From Swiss-Prot:
Cofactor(s) listed in the protein's UniProt record: FAD
One of the GO BP terms on file: cell division
Function in brief: Cell wall formation.
Major site of localization recorded for this protein: cytoplasm
UniProt similarity note: Belongs to the MurB family.
Keyword NADP tagged: yes
Organism the protein comes from: Ruegeria sp. (strain TM1040)
Localization: Cytoplasm
Entry annotated with the keyword Cell cycle: yes
UniProt protein name: UDP-N-acetylenolpyruvoylglucosamine reductase
Amino acid sequence: MTDLPAVRGRLTPNRDLSDLTWLRVGGPADYLFQPADLEDLQEFLRNLPADMDVFPMGVGSNLIVRDGGLRSVVIRLGRGFNGIEVDGDTVTAGAAALDAHVARKSAEAGVDLTFLRTIPGSIGGAVRMNAGCYGSYVADVFMSAQVVLRDGSLATLSAEDLQFKYRQTELAPGAVLVSATLRGPKGDPDALAARMEDQLRKRDETQPTKERSAGSTFRNPAGFSSTGKADDVMDLKAWKVIDNAGLRGATLGGAQMSEKHSNFMINAGGATAADLEGLGENVRKKVYADSGIWLEWEIMRVGDPKRS
């Protein structure tokens, strides 16, 4: 076993990751590191052998870890990284702060980040993936982010550094985003709270919120960045082309395309990562055969298949 740097947080070898993903699948990581604080994270990365891969992991809301696990040090931020501070119309949130919590606390202070309320996951993942909903994206409200680079140094990144695109950014490999500062328009707290309640109601009516899912499985075919027309208002939707191909409710093993929303893949019971990824690939092929459109995964898939 490789000698790793001493830490004040928790460092666990051969840590199964299935309980850390919303789909409850996946094999073990070589190591899981949960740093105590920023300095602990910096010191660890500074002294970690350069040939060891690092994979920053949020709350696992948009992730399939393959059944063979990850040959990496997985870094998962916790309580030391979930603070939320509001100053005027700016909000600084730790990467581990849940999107919903950021939206609520911002609204209480009269700052409109309500689009974050129904986005699963944490701010770190939301920034990394340029998450969006209701025609708004993180890129629209982003000011800056602090990241710890692979060598342990701390850097402040601008929107230009991250190069926001539709559902992606250009973040250096091994870099761990630790906080982000956002700026939203001012609004009446009661009106913002009411809007979020309406958003939650609509979400619960249309999405399988009681099932184990990872949010949208595929990107909408005509995905624009937030500098163009938002994909949320495009007519062509991933769920529509999936429906047109007759794949609502399609299954493979314990994996299923939800009957409630056909662009949501669920673990209907006992699914493996191979079931979920295999079903997704089946859907992609059949949609292409039906419509000529190759759907792109929105769920991140990482790791190795299980060895037979």
